[in-house]
Design a protein with these regions (language model features):
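Glycine-rich phosphate-binding loops of nucleotide-dependent enzymes
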Residues: 2-261
Length: 261
């Protein structure tokens, strides 16, 4: 099926300097609803800088970000989240001392009135809704009253992703979501990523694991020295080609580049 004509996210000529260093040089990127775009590149390629700009942690020196064709200015991470962009970083923003439900609703807790006067957290309803959400997403966390510190790495990752879904994310940026996970836990996270596509979420997926990239992504965008080096349709590529482009920043002569705008 052809993607919609208007991308959910359009990044146009994004440039970022740190002193005299140009970390990003006129980078362009489109992401459509219901697709996974892999963002690839070696260390120092510019991936982290780009996702921090999209997350509102940095502001670009040049260029613009558009959502649904509307130019956006994210001065803070809160601005980005209010625009529907959520980022799940490697260092998960979870509170180990709180339970699963409390983490899902952290910052947007449901309340009830005691004696119709005093507002109080409605823990019962939050746990009910948390159970329903995790069930709908097929997330394997049997008890929502369990402390997060007692969860496995895969469960913690799934919880952070589920929190973004509950907060009505439209674009989810996932930074190394399977790093340090075992085989079984990785499988569950990849299955969750695939299921999010059916919910029409747009996903930017950053990983050094090319096996995962080839399985879950629709397109691959490769950065090299702060520039967009290549864009490929994943099903038409393979591990050897992606490795070569990441290292050299170039495609073979027989392989046309889709876009280096």
């Amino acid at each position: 099926m052809e993607p919609p004509k208007c991308p959910l996210l359009s990044v146009r000529d994004i440039t970022k300097y740190f002193g005299g260093i140009r970390a990003l040089d006129r980078v362009n990127l489109d992401v459509y609803e219901g697709e996974v775009v892999a963002l690839l590149g070696d260390n120092g390629a510019g991936k982290s800088t780009l996702i921090k700009i999209l997350a509102g942690a940095y502001q670009p020196d040049e260029g613009e970000i558009q959502l649904d064709g509307k130019t956006m200015l994210f001065r803070t991470p809160r601005d980005a989240m209010e625009g529907g962009i959520h980022t799940v970083f490697q260092e998960l923003s979870l509170c180990d001392n709180l339970d699963v439900a409390a983490n899902l609703f952290l910052g947007s807790e449901l309340e009830k009135k005691v004696f119709n006067l005093v507002p109080w957290f409605d823990h019962f309803r939050m746990r009910q809704e948390a159970t329903t959400l995790l069930h709908d997403l097929a997330v394997d966390i049997p008890r929502v009253d369990r402390r997060v510190r007692d969860l496995s790495g895969g469960q913690r990752q799934a919880l952070a992703i589920s929190k973004a879904v509950r907060e009505k994310s439209r674009l989810l940026i996932m930074d190394e979501p399977t790093a340090a996970l075992g085989v079984a836990q990785t499988r569950k996270v990849l299955d969750l990523v695939q299921s999010l596509k059916t919910r029409n979420l747009a996903i930017i997926y950053i990983s050094h694991n090319l096996h995962d990239i080839l399985e879950v992504s629709d397109r691959c965008v490769v950065l090299k020295n702060g520039r967009k080096a290549a864009e490929l349709t994943t099903r038409e590529s393979d591990k050897e080609e992606l490795t070569s482009v990441i290292l050299t920043g170039e495609l073979t002569e027989a392989r046309p580049n889709q876009s280096t705008r």
